[in-house]
Amino acid sequence: MKITDVRVRHVSSDSRLKGVVTITFEDAFVVHDIRVIEGENGLFVAMPSKKMPNGGFRDIAHPIHADMRKQIEDSIIKAYKETLDAEATASVEE
């Protein structure tokens, strides 16, 4: 399945949440509310989830195979870093 679009909304706050992402597959299927989070070992991608009655969380949508997960994570982290670079460049130019 081909990733055809990745859109990042940068979150500027003191929290671990760094961005919220929408990803499109094959110009036909969209997944919203994927989160980019700063963890102890760097950035990671958290799939959209809902809170369960027991207090835990369950993914609403997620890849089944490791290679697809890697493809999604790599695309999202790359787009996130490009967004940060573009924002930094825009700040310098102002």
UniProtKB/Swiss-Prot annotation:
Keywords from the named record: Cell cycle, Cell division, Septation
InterPro entries: SpoVG, SpoVG_sf
Family matches, as SUPFAM superfamilies: SpoVG-like (SSF160537)
Disulfide bonds: none
GO process terms (BP): division septum assembly; sporulation resulting in formation of a cellular spore
PANTHER family with a match to the protein in the record: SEPTATION PROTEIN SPOVG-RELATED
Entry's family note: Belongs to the SpoVG family.
Function: Could be involved in septation.
Name of this chain's protein: Putative septation protein SpoVG
Species for this entry: Acholeplasma laidlawii (strain PG-8A)
Upper lineage: Bacteria, Bacillati, Mycoplasmatota, Mollicutes, Acholeplasmatales
